[in-house]
Amino acid sequence: MTVKARNRLLALLWLGLAGVAATAMALASIYLYLKPGLPSVESLRDIRLQTPLRVYSRDMKLIGEFGEKRRNPITIEQTPEPFIKAILAAEDASFYSHNGVSIKGLMRAASQLIKTGSIQSGGSTLTMQVARNFFLSREQRFVRKFNEILLSLQIEQELTKDEILALYINKIFLGNRAYGFQAAAQVYYGKDIKDLNLAQWAMMAGLPKAPSTFNPLANPSRALVRRNWILMRMLDLGYINQDQYNQSITAPVTASYHSRDLDLDAPYIAEMARKEAVDLFGDNAYTDGYQVITTVDSRLQESARNALQHGLETYDARHGYRGPEQRLAPELLQDSDQLIDLLNEIPILGGLEPGVVTAVEPKKLQVQLRDRRVIELPWSNGLSSIRPYISESARGARLQSAEKMFAPGDVIRLRKVVKEKKGSNSSSEMIATAVDEPLNADPFADPESGDTEPAEPQVTEEWVLAQVPEAQGALVSIEPEDGAIRALVGGYDFRQSHFNRATQAARQPGSSFKPFIYASAIERGYTAASIINDAPIIFEETNLQDVWRPENDGGTFLGPTRLRMALYKSRNMVSIRLLQSLGLDYALGFVEGFGFERSKLARNLTIALGSSALTPLEMVRGYAAFANGGYRVEPYLVDRVLDVNGEVLYQALPLTVCDNCPEPGTGSETLSAEPVDLAELQLEGQGVDQGEEPAELHVLPVGPLDPSKSQARPRAPRAMSAETAYIMDSMLKDVIKKGTGRRALAMKRGDIAGKTGTTNGPRDAWFSGYSPYLATSAWVGFDSYGELGKNEYGGSAALPIWIDFMSSALEGLPERHLAQPDGIVTVRINPQNGLRTSYGGMFEIFRTNRVPGREVYNPYRNRYTDEDMDMPSHDSREDSLPEELF
């Protein structure tokens, strides 16, 4: 080699070294320039993925999900190995061998930059995609690419490959609000990622490249091409064998949109819990993956929803058929696709599906359903018993021909039912698929009764004509021990109206408010045997604005009446006279102790008849005090809130009944009556009885099942003394046994109690009641304050809903009663005057210092009628409030 050639080579060598040094210095300069602006990779270990707020029942059934991004993070161990192979084949086959950067990919990106002036394909590894998704924008800029490279190198140093892959699996956007592959699997296939097959895994692995372009919903053909390319890559890389490839490559595209499946239909509960979570944590509640665990019991919630819907439908059917919801233009019937689209826009309400009448014959209809089926609705499936609605109190004559009511294009409602034919000589029973209760096949038929003999059922599926009720209702049930809401339904269907009538509809409770006035009287010194005159009374008071002449239902008066009888017969005059004697200020103060707000209570005598506007939740809180022995509890819904890792962020500490704690004062006045001879009273009998021989009751404690749990909670204050609560419990049980709540005798339980309520019109129907297990209020009425119709009372409209729910809720539970306090004795009295007697009469319970005096026996005067002896009354109607109150 010549000297000249050697010098040239040496010069080139030095030039190369200088170039390398310059490049190194340039890269170092870029690194030093960009380094301060790079985020900390360590933060990836504690990264908070945007995860929606989820609401659960107490038994962890999903009730609701709130948030813009659907994400369900999973660990790498929960990710199927074949799916991981599909991701690597699609995105980064050398993931486990490179250091975070692909030189080949970078060279390709650099070539694009030189040729076009922009970076198009990116050349990104999985690590670089993680860096971009967590820290950087998706904009294709040169500086961002350097940041991406530097971050990727740091990530590879700080995290393991599995940790990086787990971040990728959970973070990346995959279309349709789905972030992460677990959420995407649920969106596109309605399954967890572990439950998909190889073809579906390959389809999912194709989404990150372009979630819109390769979306199996928006572009199924392009998504199929991408899937098949990934399957070929998996075969070439040895991830799958030829048989697996052949089977998967021919699989059809099966993706379809799946909304998040809820385990429990409780939208009113979900909305209440959402609001409370936002009140506690602000808007972070929507993104930080909080889990709200409510107090709701899923079984009771389903029973409550079914009971309310069934009760409203039954009430509605009693008042006639209002006709089709709408009539479509005839030309729509010629376009089946447009017809189906229209049907799919009509929401299913209460399980009632919309259908369009396509043909009408005198005794049947042909109906198009939203699933493209055309069914025949025979005369016997709801048509034969139609009586047209005229008003809430009047119906037309029974329909003789379907052509008189229906025409092609009519939109009607249908219920899908299962018909169990139990035998040739027995009637058929219709059981709704959407309702747990037996449902008559013909909802508009007049109720009939008949015995059926058990036989092997033959099950067939049918459709029955129905209609969405116009009346609304609410039901709420709480645990008397601490106020935990176990079930709440705020209306017929949340899709129909988001207005929560259980918590927002303040309506007049009518006679169901009377027990609070009676309790104030018992606490003040009255007894269940105190005599009050049930006679006409007229008031001329300025705060009543006019002359007020309250009446009893039917305009009848009983004269001198014991308080017990006055309550279960719901005598208005007795309630008014009682309140008048107590004084309004005292009564209002006492009633306030049940949790009612003073500002919501009427400041006149009409409060004795339930003229104050209250919500079902407020009413059930008051009745819980009768159920738990006299304590005021506060209803609550959210038991605890967990973060995304399951750590407790919030734990409710409700007021709790605690039998073992020192009892706080009641705040009531001390009674000044002289005690009677207790030894003498013991001879007359112990126990609880309302007109019958004393019977021994099986007593179970009403306090918390876990005493240690209650000790950490604040103690519930008393609303009334234990003695008053016990006496009121006894009197309210008589409402079931002998009064306006007798329909509940069908439950065949002795531990239930409550009170009906009906307001003028009638416009509102109530039943509030309880067992020691649950306190429950049910309300029925119109949002427009319209009248419910003739012969509709609390006992006919609301009580059946309460019975339906409580029968299910208490099924299998033994009877449970309040323990008799030490200060209670049972005494034989003369029912005509409430005095103690030794001859005949009936038994009554008293506080030991309020036992009445003994009467002078007169054999010619002491004759007791069935009415005196509290025998069951045959008048099932209850009182209504006079129009002057409204």
Regions found by a protein language model. Give the residues of each.
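Beta-lactamase-like hydrolase cores
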Residues: 32-49, 197, 311-323, 343-352, ...
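A short, well-structured edge-of-sheet supersecondary motif
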Residues: 52-58, 79, 196, 353-370, ...
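Non-catalytic, structured segments within soluble enzyme domains
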Residues: 27-28, 32, 118-371, 578, ...
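Soluble, non-transmembrane domains of envelope/secretory-pathway proteins that act on or interact
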Residues: 1-3, 254, 259-260, 329-337, ...
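N-terminal type II signal-anchor transmembrane helix
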Residues: 1-56, 94, 113-114
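Active-site-adjacent helix/loop patches that line small-molecule binding or acyl-intermediate pockets
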Residues: 134, 296, 532-537, 551-596, ...
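Active-site SXXK
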Residues: 87-88, 234, 304, 362, ...
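Short, well-structured active-site flanking segments
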Residues: 96-106, 179-182, 241-244, 453-461, ...
